[in-house]
Design a protein with these regions (language model features):
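Structured core of small recognition/catalytic domains
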Residues: 144-167
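Hydrophobic, proline/glycine-rich low-complexity stretches
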Residues: 1-44, 158, 162
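Short amphipathic
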Residues: 124-137
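A broad, structural micro-motif
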Residues: 26-28, 74, 145
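A generic structural signal for short, non-catalytic loop/turn and secondary-structure boundary residues
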Residues: 21-26, 72, 123-127, 165
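HotDog/MaoC-like acyl-thioester-processing domains
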Residues: 34-124
Length: 167
């Protein structure tokens, strides 16, 4: 998903290379994935991505995972991205930075039927589960925990018994 976002953005002039040259970078803020079905092993699939909206400080990007042969949709994803200044880590105004040019790529009418994600609120019962030690291989180009490692750390919070019971 993240690589397809990069390819899509790069082809339109606001990928990582162009941003890095301007001392900016993209930061993934939220990601929601809903799969209705899973392609079986060795099945080809198509991953489509598009920008839903561009706001001042963030943009919404959606994804569709489908069969190239039948068009069957396996699932959708929604993501929220912010652009930051790499030096001071402050958000960049997307409209000033690109003079609304990103808006020309927005497809607000493209269907993405999964619910829009909101902010994750603190749990009422915030019981400590465990400390997670970050290692060099956990960190991405921006100095953040990379997305795959983040998901691995979350998955590792649950026991094997939990997964067997809730598969």
């Amino acid at each position: 998903l993240l690589n397809s976002a990069e390819y899509h953005a790069s082809a339109r002039g606001f990928g990582m290379k162009a941003l890095n040259d301007a001392n900016h970078t993209w930061v993934l803020s939220r990601l929601t994935i809903e799969m209705f079905d899973m392609p079986v092993v060795h099945t080809n699939f198509v991953l489509s991505t598009w920008i839903e909206n561009v706001y001042r400080l963030f943009t919404n990007r959606n994804y569709r995972i489908s069969s190239p042969e039948t068009g069957k949709v396996y699932g959708y994803a929604r993501s929220v991205w912010a652009m930051i200044n790499y030096a001071d880590r402050l958000p960049v105004d997307l409209h000033l930075m690109h003079g609304q040019t990103m808006d020309t790529w927005a497809c607000p009418d493209e269907d993405c039927p999964i619910e829009k994600q909101g902010r994750v609120r603190p749990l009422a019962d915030d019981t400590f589960v465990k400390n997670v030690e970050m290692k060099y291989s956990d960190i991405d180009y921006n100095g953040h925990v990379n997305s795959i490692k983040y998901i691995e750390h979350i998955c590792d919070l649950f026991s094997l018994d939990y997964y067997k019971e809730h598969h």
